[in-house]
Amino acid sequence: MLIFPLLNDLSRKIIHIDMDAFFAAVEIKDNPKLRGKPVIIGSDPRQTGGRGVVSTCSYEARAFGVHSAMSSKEAYERCPQAVFISGNYEKYKAVGLQIRAIFKRYTDLIEPMSIDEAYLDVTENKLGIKSAVKIARLIQKDIWQELHLTASAGISYNKFLAKMASDYQKPHGLTVILPEQAEDFLKQMDISKFHGVGKKTVERLHQMGVFTGADLLEVPEVTLIDRFGRLGYDLYRKARGIHNSPVKSNRIRKSIGKEKTYGKILRAEEDIKKELTLLSEKVALNLHQQEKAGKIVILKIRYEDFSTLTKRKSIAQKTQDASQISQIALQLYEELSEKERGVRLLGITMTGF
């Protein structure tokens, strides 16, 4: 039974489409000899001195614990038999535009989240189809027949639940969460599977004895806000499936960044520079996925005494290149760093799109 019927617009029909291992799938489509093999999109660490991050990987590679944003070195250690392929982002962008064109056959209310995923509001759609399930199946069919790629689909009455649904059965899955099913669906879900709940937050929730959606549902809102601030308010709403943000076809992202808090204070300059390089590669990956390039690099450093400093640098030409971002970040570090102070957090952000 729903405990939050008045806090959601239950009439919306939202589809979340997420391409399955998109970059790897495009490469396998173009080279069928790769089918069935562990394929990793990213620099081969044997050729880069261990540098690089995984953009994505095939499900065969995921079986070895490889995942997006993992360092290429660790990916190789987990799966030495993998085929490493440097990303061809222009090719992926072209395929992404073909997928976007398929979406537009059904609705113009499309909110792309990256090159390989988007929300679609099909409450009112171009073909007058009443069933969101039918539309999702037609989209999956179109993508397969025209591009020989698979996509997973999630359907619900808001974006949060649609995203949770698309993640539930992959690859090539289709999951529907009806209003009367939402509470039970979220209750049984591991808290680490909640969209928008990061690793550090999961660890803190575990310390509170929260491991599932059912556990989270029992925590009072005031307790969550006291422990997590604004995030606590969001967690309280997620436990109840509340998400009122509409699908925004003109969504504009103003910045893309990555930051990491270190459990062990970083003191060695070599370690700090290594982490900055890795963060730069992750930011570059996100830029490619979001089809963005920026002209401003922002470095953030939080020291062991919790004091935080930021410094930015503008460049003449927009970039999404990992090596260029890394070079600028390292330069900013040299200008900003107080070498005798330990570092507990590093962050790199690109803006100026």
From Swiss-Prot:
Superkingdom of source: Bacteria
Location in the cell: Cytoplasm
Alphabetic keyword roster: Cytoplasm, DNA damage, DNA repair, DNA replication, DNA-binding, DNA-directed DNA polymerase, Magnesium, Metal-binding, Mutator protein, Nucleotidyltransferase, Transferase
Major enzyme class: transferase
SUPFAM superfamilies cross-referenced by the UniProt entry: DNA/RNA polymerases (SSF56672), Lesion bypass DNA polymerase (Y-family), little finger domain (SSF100879)
Gene Ontology molecular function: any one: magnesium ion binding
Matching Gene3D superfamilies: 3.30.70.270, 3.40.1170.60, 5' to 3' exonuclease, C-terminal subdomain, DNA polymerase, Y-family, little finger domain
UniProt cofactor(s): Mg(2+)
Name of encoding gene: dinB
Entry annotation: catalytic residues: 117
Name used for this protein in its record: DNA polymerase IV
